[in-house]
Amino acid sequence: MESADVVIAGGGIMGCALAYQLAKRDVDVLLLERETLGSQSTGKCAGGVRQQFSMEANVRLQRMAVKILEGFEAETGHPADFRQIGYLFVLTLPQQVEDFRHNMEMWHRVGLTEARWVDPAEAARMVPVLNVDDVLGCTFCPSDGIASPADVTSGYATAARRHGARLKEGVEVIGIDVASGRVQGVSTSTGDVATRLVFNCAGAWSASIGRMAGLEIPVLPYRRHIAVTGTFPAVPRTNPMTVDFRTSFYFHPEGDGVLMGMSDREDPPGYSTDVDWNFLEKVFEQAARRAPALAGAGLKTAWAGLYETTPDHQAILGPVPEVEGFWCAAGFSGHGFMQAPAAAVLLSQLLLDKESEIDIGPFAFTRFAKGALVKERNVI
């Protein structure tokens, strides 16, 4: 029977980053992905990397992630295509301005001192296509940006294999053997594996992996759409990721065109990734309001992926006490690509050193039983 110190269920950015961090510390790692690495939510995300969150723990996590991505190629030998064009949050309601004032105070306190306020006139200069008629203010952080999900995932996977990790594609986890309250092994579509520790990195499918161990992991899948225009020079590659916070509409330069998206707040949870063309019409309607020039941009392609959403829009990181040897790195609620680099480091530290350099206690699974939920408000 095959065996491993750690089995990772899921080969998206989180699983691959964790495989790398554990393997480079001489842990015998087996990662199992039922399709191909990075082919699900990771491969369908917008690639955003930001630090402007409402929860301090998320800001600290993201400051670490940005530093990791800045040094990614030097560490892994693989480019990340991390372009720090910044994130511009566009605020149109008085309550948003008040909330972001509190955010800004916290950001500066924890060291994100480059984040600053931008008035509507400056925002219009930064993003010439932006309609600022109803804008009350904006926040901007120049060290935020966008990176390539494919490059970062591939870089982690290659580096993990270089350190001895086994990453298997086309192999599905179909069961977890639990005896006397602890993990004993996993069953897969190609055979059984003996292990004492399983990491649930299955993204939108994390609840299914949890149920295999008799656990209820509160993660639901929600469809999110992305559209990319044809060539559109009015949004140059230096423009920031721009977010209309009230509607969740966002856009950023993508190649010689523009990538845009928006949350469908009426879409129920489910695993469909079919494109809803009626909803895409709403995206373009909002684009025409917030950035009128985009109304003339032709659609080049569109797709949909899945958010893995928890009740408080915060990740679940660390051990699940009910089953010894079952750990989670899931439920990132749309922030998995940007948070995985730091989460992988901190989880490997917690597992091997019994403590992490940044406290990830706020992301513990036990918060659900305690009812100690504090929602992350800056969700797109």
Predicted segments with their positions:
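Helical element adjacent to the flavin cofactor pocket in flavoenzyme catalytic cores
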Residues: 139-196
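N-terminal Rossmann-like FAD-binding beta1-loop-alpha1 element of flavoenzymes
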Residues: 4-30
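Short beta-strand to alpha-helix junction loop
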Residues: 60-61, 90-98, 140-158, 274-279
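Active-site lid/adjacent beta-loop-alpha segment flanking the redox-cofactor pocket in flavoenzymes
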Residues: 216, 231-328
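Central helical "cap/lid" subdomain
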Residues: 191-238
